[in-house]
Design a protein with these regions (language model features):
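Histidine-acidic metal/acid-base catalytic patches
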Residues: 28, 59, 63, 71, ...
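Active-site acidic/histidine proton-transfer and metal-coordination neighborhood
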Residues: 1-105
Length: 216
């Protein structure tokens, strides 16, 4: 989404190359991350990130990438987050429709999109919008959690699985219903916290009636 054509062109070429590598590795898909106008990092806020101008630029960039993905037989898995140009379930659906390719899907990562008290305290309703609008496009998911920090100004932080506010059993249940063959990545867990997070994931999976396939 960078307005500098040289920088944007280099990024487009990088993702095109990733499509070719993904095909050679016979991997299921590769991520498409929207970026940011903020020069300090791709997952940081900027006043223009939610504008139609940046959205249209992202659509145009993706159309250049998607032809390579189609030729290579590779799926692109769209990521997003509230601070990014893909800031809601509705915006993600609008983006997928605008690009108009069967090779563009969606990675369910709802924690990235939490942006209000109402969403934080009603995560089932929040999750359901993503599954309703993007269920048919879902390729996989990231599993993590969040909490609200006790402070005057609204602030969210990631939390270890099992200690946060997301209804994980409902999330896994709906993932299993809409995309039973999905891969789900437990994300942003330090090594010393991985084992308890794993056990919590299994606990939520049992509550959701999910049996995981063995990885080979």
């Amino acid at each position: 989404v960078n307005p500098d054509q040289t920088i944007r062109g280099n990024c487009i070429k990088f993702v095109q190359d990733m499509c070719e590598l993904t095909s050679k590795l016979e991997a299921p898909n590769t991520y498409l991350r929207p970026g940011s106008i903020n020069t300090n990092g791709p997952w940081l806020p900027h006043p223009e990130n939610h504008t139609d101008k940046v959205f249209d630029r992202l659509v145009n960039s993706t159309k250049e990438i998607i032809t390579v993905a189609e030729n290579e037989g590779v799926m692109l898995s769209l990521e997003g987050g509230y601070v990014s140009p893909i800031f809601s379930a509705k915006r993600a659906k609008e983006f997928i429709d605008a690009v108009g390719s069967k090779n563009l899907g969606f990675n369910q990562d709802p924690v990235n999109f939490i942006s209000s008290i109402e969403q934080a305290y009603n995560t089932r309703e929040f999750l359901e919008e993503f599954f309703t609008l993007l269920g048919n496009h879902t390729l996989g998911a990231h599993l993590k959690d969040f909490t609200i920090i006790d402070t005057l100004l609204l602030r969210f932080e990631e939390e270890y699985i099992g200690s946060g506010m997301m209804d994980q059993a409902y999330f896994l249940k709906r993932m299993n219903e809409i995309c039973p063959d999905a891969h789900i990545l437990v994300e942003h867990i330090p090594r010393d916290k991985f084992e308890p997070s794993y056990h919590k994931t299994i606990e939520y999976s049992n509550a959701a009636g999910i049996k995981w396939e063995s990885y080979k």
